[in-house]
Amino acid sequence: MKNYLSFGMFALLFALTFGTVNSVQAIAGPEWLLDRPSVNNSQLVVSVAGTVEGTNQDISLKFFEIDLTSRPAHGGKTEQGLSPKSKPFATDSGAMSHKLEKADLLKAIQEQLIANVHSNDDYFEVIDFASDATITDRNGKVYFADKDGSVTLPTQPVQEFLLSGHVRVRPYKEKPIQNQAKSVDVEYTVQFTPLNPDDDFRPGLKDTKLLKTLAIGDTITSQELLAQAQSILNKNHPGYTIYERDSSIVTHDNDIFRTILPMDQEFTYRVKNREQAYRINKKSGLNEEINNTDLISEKYYVLKKGEKPYDPFDRSHLKLFTIKYVDVDTNELLKSEQLLTASERNLDFRDLYDPRDKAKLLYNNLDAFGIMDYTLTGKVEDNHDDTNRIITVYMGKRPEGENASYHLAYDKDRYTEEEREVYSYLRYTGTPIPDNPNDK
């Protein structure tokens, strides 16, 4: 009788389809994989949700991939590293296969579940696979577990397998401490990111330094950490200053369940109680006590000294323009619009049929708006007040047979050089605006 990838009393089946990664949260079904580009290595796409034990609550997980080959294509890195137990091996027929251990799969899912946690109250612990967890290949073939709970997947031909369904989870609770740790080495690392777009900033490698050794229950404040960060910034990037803290996370003895510290208020971190750490003495082979570790990892936004934070909603530097297009013969308003622009250099005529002019603000014809057969006459009124600059462009009908790019105002037989010069500052960005707008 086949073993349905039985993990405890629950069956784990496995289902696949084909492709490579797009930025989506979950895989809805086989149809999703049909649109994915072909892959270079065989992969297991893990797209599962968590179901909280004893409730109807579901926990969403972002999908991820596990490379089933010994080396990623193009020198890349796998998104999830698995232990040596899960590795490719040759079958009797010579084809490569990959054996996935149940514990490795659960660990990879646990790490993905934790990766996007933003609060200490949001931690869940993965218990086991639910009964609907399934692996298939692109043909719908189900892959069953061996007696030891592992699953063997072929890596040739190159394809993707899909692990879907659910894992059972429960709120994380710390285990009772049997042998309390005596002291903790508090280590520190920091990462800086420019708040404003900044091509000059070159982040260095993150160095880890030992801050101090503390006893269980001793404290370190957010101000002490800020001082450490500023000291490192002054040394490596003297032209910058810290703007604000983005995150502070404490990793306890490489435990995946970390302490997330507040980022928007002052805090005091109290060294967490935990089990005493040990290592094996290479000579004696016996366990010996070592200092436990807390790694405090921080991220800060920084600014160039003297620079203000960029505000995408700040319009104080923009100027308001009202553009009116008027029939020169009837004074009928053909079209009106208001524009905000940071540069008056864009106040120039554009040809709607010429993509090179797309940054310019004034139109030499209105065909695109269904107002046909008009062109420039050379008459432009330019009026200013404290908050608005009003440009009135007078337009006339094009001669019959002329196309939309015809410029009546550029015809030297109709307008003198002096008349053309009157409005030239609107057409040539290098010509200054008159001191007195009425002197035109």
Curated annotation (Swiss-Prot):
Record keywords: Plasminogen activation, Signal, Virulence
Keyword Signal (UniProt): yes
Any one Pfam family match given in the protein's UniProt record, by short name: Staphylokinase
Functional summary from the UniProt entry: This protein is not a protease, but it activates plasminogen by complexing with it. As a potential virulence factor, it is thought to prevent the formation of effective fibrin barriers around the site of infection, thereby contributing to the invasiveness of the cells.
Protein's recorded name: Streptokinase C
Keyword Transmembrane applies: no
Residues spanning the signal sequence: 1-26
CC terms in the record's Gene Ontology section: extracellular region
